[in-house]
Amino acid sequence: KKEGMGICHGDFNQHNIVFRSEYAAVISFDNICYDVQIGDLARFMRKILEKNNWNMGLGMEMIRAYSDKKAMSPYETKQLYLRLAYPEKFWKIANHYYNANKAWGFGRYLEKLEKIKAEEENREQFLAYMKHFAYS
């Protein structure tokens, strides 16, 4: 068995967690997969941090909360960093533009790219801080 590998939800985000007074439940296992388990944390963090302008304190608190339940190995820490560093949002927009017969119109693509550009400084600061832990 490879380090950190196991069954993953595959689309772990805030929309797939149901909170009740006595418990929380994870739903929608349509994308279940065998992967590095830290991948679920990376997907969850990306969604939350994008909505919170890559807030450093929030991101580090999410990592601490995860680590309190399951310690991350150096390999998993690097995996988390690399998965968050991948420019997923840019890739999705570029891929959509290339493959979707320009359904949105060029202005819509520019608008989405400008939004990514506005988030980039905070994203890069967060990633620089995280890189220190992943590669030290």
Language model: regions and residue ranges:
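All-alpha amphipathic helical-bundle segments outside canonical DNA-binding/catalytic cores
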Residues: 72-82
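ATP/Mg2+ or Mg2+-diphosphate-binding catalytic cores
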Residues: 91-136
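Alpha-helical structural motif
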Residues: 37-40, 76, 109, 122
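Short flexible/disordered coil segments
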Residues: 11-17, 29, 71-72, 115-119, ...
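Active-site activation/catalytic loop segments of kinase-like enzymes and analogous catalytic loops
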Residues: 38-71, 84-102
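Active-site acidic catalytic loop and adjacent metal/ATP-binding pocket
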Residues: 1-39
